[in-house]
Regions:
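N-terminal secretory/targeting leader peptides
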Residues: 1-59, 74, 82-177
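Hinge/lid segment of periplasmic solute-binding proteins
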Residues: 62-80
Length: 177
């Protein structure tokens, strides 16, 4: 009888690329954020814009639409991946590292010169560059260290991530949508 082995991890530092193809006869499932998946399947990068879909139903409408299947899913499949579903964790929050200043982001001008942590998403890098920030690519697993060392000044995770990954101790307040 076939068996199934489940492995759950919070992060996978020092591990092979999480998007590598599985061995023959092995089903491999990965849960990746769209921003971390975008370098391997750039078509999904369009949904990385913070606050783009807003409400969950709008996101569901987008990723289940015929045009999404035609323009995005077909390109992801052409790269050798088969997405089971897309997910969006919102709202996002923009939070600064402790010691930078105590003021929350309120306007785009507040981002000028800020070293803003971004993943491998080209769209997010361009988004923050247009707002006047200095987008700083940092892998998710290295983000707490980068924030502590001042390599990055701010980031925009979902509120849940601030608590789940220990950021509440290294970031001052945040601004959420």
């Amino acid at each position: 009888m076939p068996s199934c082995r489940w492995t759950f991890t919070r992060s996978v530092p020092n591990r092979p690329n999480p998007t590598t193809r599985p061995s023959q006869f092995l089903a491999s499932f990965r849960v990746l954020s769209n921003s971390n998946f975008a370098p391997f399947a750039p078509a999904v990068d369009m949904i990385n814009l913070p606050y783009w879909c807003g409400e969950n139903q709008r996101f569901v409408n987008l990723v289940t639409s015929d045009i999404w299947q035609k323009e995005v899913v077909s390109r992801v499949r052409a790269k050798g991946f088969k997405p089971l579903f897309f997910f969006c964790i919102d709202p996002r929050t923009a939070a600064k590292r402790k010691g930078l200043d105590d003021k929350p982001f309120k306007t785009p001008d507040d981002l000028k010169g800020i070293k803003f942590r971004v993943p491998g998403s080209k769209i997010l890098q361009q988004f923050y560059r247009l707002l006047g920030a200095n987008p700083t690519p940092v892998a998710w697993g290295e983000t707490p260290t980068a924030i502590k060392q001042g390599v990055a000044d701010a980031l925009d995770p979902a509120v849940e991530a601030l608590y789940a990954f220990g950021f509440k101790d290294i970031l001052s307040g945040g601004t959420s949508n």
